[in-house]
């Protein structure tokens, strides 16, 4: 398309649904196109053309029937969009040739027809639009240049512009014809004295989305950013750009959000070139990507930079190569070298610049994480690489996914940043009982009611479901502030605690989300304090009777041995969490337990340690630990040291009778009953078995079993080791 044009083609369209200012907001198809040529040199007009378009669905809205006068019968006889666009191109080209002109530009009454209707519909139908549909003149903006006092561009209409210059609107019965005639009158008017206007400011539609890096220091206008929610997990930045086809996304302006496991959570932040395009993007709320509808909301520049921004020179250099396909590799052996990766990919998918096109993700201390990003020069090479998904390198299968520049930044930011708390400290020996603090070390207890409790969650609910349930309030969650409560079998209990940024935010969530539905269940939401949350996370209960203290023992590791629990302060019943403090009645004080005296310290259950390490940081990728790591130790050493320091004299621990046997290689569906059957004849009880879970809350294939004596444990290891359970040979070992 030339930088200037000999002619304008005045272009008008209508859909089967909303028209006017809401054109394209309901995803309805084009049913009518009207056009007419205007010679800018001779101030002459060509023939007026009107063509019906057959949609895939001829269901017309009442507004459409009233405004256009069209019927389903007429549309069934029309040609489909692809044929009509070919007719349009041939007709305009022939007419231009007869006029002796060489180029033309579309002229429309606002950008909606081109950006919100034609490009999205052509994209969904896999139609290739002619080049002329990527450049156009917006008559409203051109008129505003001539008549700036006519009002803001967004408030201008065809009739208001005609009224401003005192032109009588065309009297025409057929819809489309009158609009085109009125637009032609306006164009001829501004071409003449006193305006003598030159049409030179052309709007453009991007041919494709350009990926790129974004710096944390870059200024991002919040009026240009949206959040898209409900995306298919496998969608890429190109898929999102296609969903917003017709709107111009800034370079590197798609940032896919990741969950705590480093997987896409169905959300993305998208940055457009200006606020006008952002506003049109908001009108695509609940439009469809395939069979899924996508929610579109306003977002901020700060949120975008949190996901897409990066400062690493290594990342900037890696992403400096433009128009590259990015593939993420996950699960690499920690000893893998660049040559190993290049050999795995093979000659059929050459990496851009060889080893320079590889970026290994590492921890701050230089240890590899098992992730890497790879650059490919074209789509063909990227597709060949994706065919190697779950093939073996060394002894591990490798996952390959499409990735984006923003995802590279996210993952590197996460791994290279210093964690707020150590995620996996070296554990103490499992046979040694350790005194710990009476509160979780990661939570500062207090009476400030800046937490919420979710009760009645579906047992299949994951952290992503909770974040979706909270909606817009997700941004008010503290880092590492989501705590899933598991029962003593390591299964979800239906409860979760969430730490909010303030008591006001917690109160707001409790008010708005209480008894809101999640899947097929309603969920109760109560405001509470960190003190109440700590009691429950340690094994206590928070119910209609108020708080009950946690049992002071290590479950499943030894026969019951209780320690005294000091009298707790006044506790609030759960229902009180919905009300502000002035409305609360005086709470009652629970009675202290009457067990035999013992040192004043408590034990963490394995449940607590798992809960604390399943915390979630919004949009962060996988936690810096191996997914197969088993979390069954009583407490992290930090809390151990603090507890020991707090003791005036060395604590005397109650004796731990029995001996512990570790089982490895269990089927993932094996439960306590299966393990008891495996050790039939050893007179074990259900509470002697502890099934271990990994960081994802799934069974790890291991268990700990307490035998009444060391002799019985050694006999079980000798007799039962390598005996199959459901086809899996079980390895047994005594824990010394």
Curated annotation (Swiss-Prot):
InterPro entries assigned: ESRP, Nucleotide-bd_a/b_plait_sf, RBD_domain_sf, RNaseH-like_sf, RNaseH_sf, RRM_dom
GO molecular function, one term: mRNA binding
Keyword Nucleus: yes
UniProt xrefs under CDD domains: RRM2_ESRP2, RRM3_ESRP1_ESRP2, RRM5_RBM12_like
Annotated TM spans: none
Function (record text): mRNA splicing factor that regulates the formation of epithelial cell-specific isoforms. Specifically regulates the expression of FGFR2-IIIb, an epithelial cell-specific isoform of fgfr2. Acts by directly binding specific sequences in mRNAs. Binds the GU-rich sequence motifs in the ISE/ISS-3, a cis-element regulatory region present in the mRNA of fgfr2.
Protein name, UniProt field: Epithelial splicing regulatory protein 2
Lineage: Eukaryota, Metazoa, Chordata, Craniata, Vertebrata
């Amino acid at each position: 398309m030339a930088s200037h044009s000999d002619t304008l083609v005045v272009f008008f369209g209508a859909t089967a649904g909303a028209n006017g200012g809401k054109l394209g907001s309901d995803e309805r198809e084009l049913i009518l196109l009207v056009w007419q040529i205007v010679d800018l040199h001779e101030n002459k007009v060509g023939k007026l053309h009107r063509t019906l378009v057959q949609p895939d669905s001829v269901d017309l809205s009442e507004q459409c029937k009233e405004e256009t006068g069209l019927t389903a019968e007429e549309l069934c006889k029309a040609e489909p969009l692809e044929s009509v666009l070919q007719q349009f191109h041939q007709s305009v080209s022939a007419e231009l040739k007869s006029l002796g002109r060489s180029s033309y530009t579309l002229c429309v009454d606002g950008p909606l027809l081109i950006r919100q209707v034609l490009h999205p519909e052509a994209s969904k139908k896999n139609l290739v639009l002619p080049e002329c549909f990527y450049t156009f003149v917006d008559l409203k903006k051109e008129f505003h240049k001539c008549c700036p006092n006519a009002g803001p561009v967004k408030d201008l209409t065809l009739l208001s512009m005609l009224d401003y210059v005192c032109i009588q609107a065309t009297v025409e019965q057929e819809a489309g014809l009158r609009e085109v005639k009125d637009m032609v009158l306006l164009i001829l008017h501004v071409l003449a004295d006193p305006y003598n206007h030159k049409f030179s400011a052309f709007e453009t539609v991007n041919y494709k989305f350009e990926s790129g890096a974004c710096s944390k220091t870059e200024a991002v206008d919040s009026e240009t950013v949206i959040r898209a929610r409900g995306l298919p997990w496998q969608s890429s930045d190109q898929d999102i750009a296609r969903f917003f086809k017709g709107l111009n996304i800034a370079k590197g302006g798609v940032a896919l959000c990741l969950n705590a496991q480093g997987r896409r959570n169905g959300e993305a932040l998208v940055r457009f070139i200006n606020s006008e395009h952002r506003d049109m993007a908001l009108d695509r709320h609940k439009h469809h990507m395939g069979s899924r509808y996508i929610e579109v909301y306003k977002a901020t520049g700060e949120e975008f930079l949190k996901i897409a921004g990066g400062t690493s020179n290594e990342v900037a250099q890696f992403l400096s190569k433009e128009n590259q396909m990015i593939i993420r590799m996950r699960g690499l052996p920690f000893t893998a070298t660049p040559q190993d990766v290049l050999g795995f990919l093979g000659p059929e998918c050459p990496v851009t610049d060889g080893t320079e096109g590889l970026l290994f993700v590492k921890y701050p201390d230089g240890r590899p994480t098992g992730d890497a990003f790879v650059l490919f020069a074209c789509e063909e090479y990227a597709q060949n690489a994706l065919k190697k998904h779950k093939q073996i390198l060394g002894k591990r299968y490798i996952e390959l996914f499409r990735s984006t520049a923003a995802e590279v930044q996210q993952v590197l930011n996460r791994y290279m940043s210093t964690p707020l708390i150590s995620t996996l400290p070296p554990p103490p020996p499992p046979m040694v009982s350790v005194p710990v603090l009476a509160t979780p070390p990661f939570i500062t207890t207090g009476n400030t009611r800046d937490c919420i409790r979710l009760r009645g969650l579906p047992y299949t609910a994951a952290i992503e479901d909770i974040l979706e349930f909270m909606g817009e309030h997700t941004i008010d969650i503290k880092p590492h502030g989501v705590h899933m409560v598991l029962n003593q079998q390591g299964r979800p209990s239906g409860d979760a605690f969430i730490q909010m940024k303030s008591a006001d935010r917690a109160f707001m969530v409790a008010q708005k989300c209480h008894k809101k539905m999640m899947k097929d269940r309603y969920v109760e939401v109560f405001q509470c304090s960190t003190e109440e949350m700590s009691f429950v996370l340690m094994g206590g209960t928070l119910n209609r009777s108020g708080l009950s203290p946690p049992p002071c023992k290590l479950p499943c590791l030894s026969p019951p041995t209780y320690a005294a629990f000091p009298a707790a302060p006044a506790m609030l019943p759960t229902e009180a969490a919905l009300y502000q403090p002035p409305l609360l009645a005086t709470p009652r004080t629970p009675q202290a337990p009457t067990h035999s005296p013992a040192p004043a310290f408590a034990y963490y259950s394995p449940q607590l340690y798992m809960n604390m390490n399943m915390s979630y940081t919004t949009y962060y990728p996988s936690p810096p630990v191996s997914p197969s790591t088993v979390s069954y130790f009583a407490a992290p050493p930090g809390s151990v040291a603090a507890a020991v320091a707090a003791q005036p004299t060395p604590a005397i621990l109650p004796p731990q009778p029995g001996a512990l046997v570790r089982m490895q290689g269990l089927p993932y569906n094996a439960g306590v009953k299966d393990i008891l059957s495996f050790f039939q004849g050893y007179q074990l009880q259900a509470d002697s078995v502890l099934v271990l879970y990994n960081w994802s809350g799934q069974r790890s294939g291991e268990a700990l079993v307490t035998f009444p004596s060391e002799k019985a444990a050694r006999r079980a290891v000798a007799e039962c080791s390598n005996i199959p359970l459901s086809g899996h040979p079980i390895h047994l070992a005594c824990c010394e």
